Structure formats: C-alpha cells, structure tokens
C-alpha cells in the first residue's frame, strides 16, 4: 500500500511538471508578441505591446492619449527644434521622456540624434517620411514603422486612427475624437449664439520672409477656426488649400468681421502701421485677436495641442481678447 501511494505521488508530480512545461506562461498581448502591420514601406513586424517607444513622427501626443510607453520623442518646438513645447513640458518631465530631435525637420542641426536613440535601446521606433533618409539606420536599431504622412499635417485624424489600428486601440481613438468633436460643437454653438454668421480670416506674419504673411484655410489654426468651430470664412479666404503666402496688399481682398493674427511677439508690429491694414473692417471694429506664432505652431497640428488651442481660440472670441 505504501509503495502504491508513493507511485501515485510520483505520477502526480510528473504530470504536474509536464503541464507546467507545456503551458505558455506569456500573457496575451505581452511584450514578446508581434503583429504585422502595413505602413508606407509595406508590411513590417512590430511589438504588439511595445514598452520602449521612440517617436520621431510627431505622434507623441496621440501615443500618450492611448497610454503607450514613450521613452523618447521628437515632438519639440517647431521654432527651435530643441525645446519641449509648454503644453508638453510637465508630461515629458513626469514620464522621463528624452528629446531626440524634431519630427518636422526643424531642428537646428537638421537631424535626429541617432546615437542617443540607439543608447536608449527602444523596442519600437515610429517615424514619418520627413526622416526617410535615415530609415535604414533607424531600422538597424529597432523595428521601425513609418506612419502614413501627408506632410502638411492636415490628416492628423488619419494618423491617429492608424496608430489605433496598429495597437488594437481603435475604440480609444474613436472615443477621444468623439469627445473632441463634442467639445468643438459646444464651443461653436456658444460663438454662433454671440456673433451669428459673422466672417473670419486667419493670418500669420511670416517669421522667415519678412513682409509676407500666411493666410490659413485647412491647415492648423485655419482648420480649428473653419472646420472645428464652424466659423464662416471671409471673402478672399482661399478655398481647398492648406494656406497661401501673400503680401500685405492681399489685406484689401479680405472683408472679415473678425481676424486672428499671429506673429512672433503676438502683436501687429509694423503691420499695424500699414494703411491697407487699418482699412480692414475687423481692424476698424477692434475685432482682431492676436496670438503668438510659436504657440500656434506647437499646438494647432497635433491632438492634445488642438484640444487646448481650440478652447483658446474660442475664448478669444467669447471674451473679446487675445489668444492666451
């Protein structure tokens, strides 16, 4: 009887060990899983649940919204390509996110810091076509995926949705976009109740070519004003374009009731002395809302920034003040 009991105990132990050996102890969606996705280069295998993402595609805000683990980013200032934008500074500090260049190519060096990227030992690199020249070098460091990119940043929703597809987070993306659209609709209704169908134009004093201006339509602040807040474009605002570079004489074509005007210091400067500026309807009525170039460049093109800047633009109108 004793021998039989010992034999049974032995068999139980053998089967238990065999079961443990045959069981996959890696949880579903673990860091060791990979998924094949389609990007601008074709098909590529990437981690399904990456733990050390280096983003040089300008998608850090979207990745953080999706609670992805970003260790380094190129979401730096569109002006100097080095400093962290004000609305991201706390997040970067809290999460220890390193800076490795600028996603738009605006860095003063013109390049990504490949050496630093390699030192960080990422398990995934997300890039855009602006850095295509270093694709092979990035791919040698870690699996590298290239987001579909229209260069002009108008397709920010499409890029966000592509991230959701890659990482099985489509529902989270759709929820964020629905909340964003609801907020935009609420602000648009408040503005409409106050000013009705009065018209708008969005100008930027060009920081590079002195004496010229951007007039926006579908890009950045133009998208926020016309497409999200549903405000009416003035006569003279171009259609079906990101924006256009114009000179001061173009002001004579604008018949806007309200103007957003962005410049490096947030004032009209020498533009305010021009007769053609003084003759515009919005200027005469005192309906000019001034904003700072760096702020709108850093906030009006990516998800978190858009949500914040949308409210800033709306508040400028509702409070009849500047974009602050």
Predicted regions located by residue number:
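Bacterial signal peptide processing site
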Residues: 21-24
């Amino acid at each position: 009887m004793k021998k039989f009991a010992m034999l049974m105990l032995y068999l139980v132990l053998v089967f238990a060990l065999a079961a443990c050996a045959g069981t996959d102890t890696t949880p579903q969606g673990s860091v060791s899983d990979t998924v094949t996705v389609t990007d601008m280069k074709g098909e590529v295998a990437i981690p399904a649940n990456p733990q050390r993402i280096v983003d040089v595609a300008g998608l850090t805000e979207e990745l953080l919204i999706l609670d992805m683990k970003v260790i380094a980013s190129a979401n730096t200032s569109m002006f100097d390509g080095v400093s962290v934008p004000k609305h991201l500074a706390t997040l970067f500090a809290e999460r220890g996110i390193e800076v490795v260049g600028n996603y738009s190519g605006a860095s003063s060096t013109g390049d990504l810091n490949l050496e630093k990227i390699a030192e960080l030992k990422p398990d995934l690199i997300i890039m855009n076509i602006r850095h295509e020249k270093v694709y092979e070098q990035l791919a040698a460091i870690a699996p590298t995926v290239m987001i579909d990119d229209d260069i002009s940043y108008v397709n920010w929703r499409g890029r966000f949705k592509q991230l959701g597809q890659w990482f099985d987070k489509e529902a989270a993306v759709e929820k964020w976009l629905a909340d964003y659209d609801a907020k935009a609709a609420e602000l648009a209704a408040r503005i409409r109740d106050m000013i009705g169908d009065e018209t708008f134009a969005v100008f930027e004093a060009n920081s590079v070519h002195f004496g010229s201006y951007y007039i926006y339509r579908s890009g950045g602040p133009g998208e926020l004003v016309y497409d999200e807040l549903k405000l009416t474009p003035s006569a003279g605002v171009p259609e079906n374009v990101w924006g256009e570079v114009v000179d001061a004489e173009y002001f004579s074509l604008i018949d806007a009731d309200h103007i957003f005007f962005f410049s490096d210091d947030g004032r009209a400067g020498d533009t305010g002395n021009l007769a053609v500026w003084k003759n515009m309807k919005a200027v005469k009525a005192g309906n000019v809302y001034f904003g700072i170039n760096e702020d709108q460049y850093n906030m009006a093109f990516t998800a978190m920034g858009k949500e914040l800047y949308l409210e800033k633009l709306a508040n400028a109108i509702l409070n009849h003040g500047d974009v602050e």
